[in-house]
Amino acid sequence: ALICPGNTLDLTERELEVVRRYWEDEKGGLVFYLDASAKTPNMNALLREHGVGPRGDRVLSVLSIPGMTSKKTYDVAVALMPGAGPTKDLPALTTQLMGQTQSLDVLYEDDLLIAENIRPRPLMAAREGFWGETDFQTEEVSYNPDIDHGQPELVYTSASVEKGVAGDYDFKKGSSRLVVVGNPDLISPDGNTSKVGADFTMASLNWVMNREELIGITPRRPTAYTLSVSAEDQGLLQSLMIFMMPGLALIIGGVVWVRRRA
């Protein structure tokens, strides 16, 4: 699989041709983590061609605290969407996308794409209260239904695409797969990747490489805990084990013996 984690430079025409050939002809896997501030028209064109359009906005919300000035936040609370694709074996987990995120226009009901056997699907949606703001550079923002995205429609921040041979709607002849996220920091080079982000990334890589059997929540690393017991508590535990428990067993045995003799 080929992963592009937050590319700040666009693909050249030659690189785009190589990537397209790898994906369509060799049925390779692609994973894009888009940098919302980067200008990548060639990469975006490839995605739009297959039903996923980066919008160039910023997903945000406004925090209102009584007595304080309202403040916009770019840390987006998102939920994974169950269904076909890399999230099908993951429960409806939630996480935060840190930094700046752009929303995605996912054409999962487009008749033309369906006829061409191209299946885009949303994978992540922002929680209630977030929207795709087009005029995000201004200090004070508010949702404008004429130019912004969301409310009441869901704001998608990740999507998958599966493309098969024309007429092969069950993908029995194989398929080309890609996953795109509108945020470059789902996996952090500083080692601050969330558990949900790591699970989603591994699931995406396994899915685009047709290794569905490996998709799921990764096992947690065993952690050793030390239980500190004071001298007084230790003496109490010893008394319970030496006197109380044998005494209790003796009493129960005596009761049973008496009842049987009666």
Predicted feature locations:
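Alpha-helical transmembrane segments
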Residues: 246-259
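Acidic, S/T/G-rich, low-cysteine, solvent-exposed domains in lumenal/extracellular/periplasmic regions
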Residues: 1-213
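Intrinsically disordered or highly flexible coil/loop and linker segments, enriched in small
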Residues: 210-217, 249
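Short, aromatic-rich amphipathic segments at membrane interfaces
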Residues: 186, 216-241
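Short, charged low-complexity intrinsically disordered segments located at boundaries
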Residues: 73-80, 229-240, 254
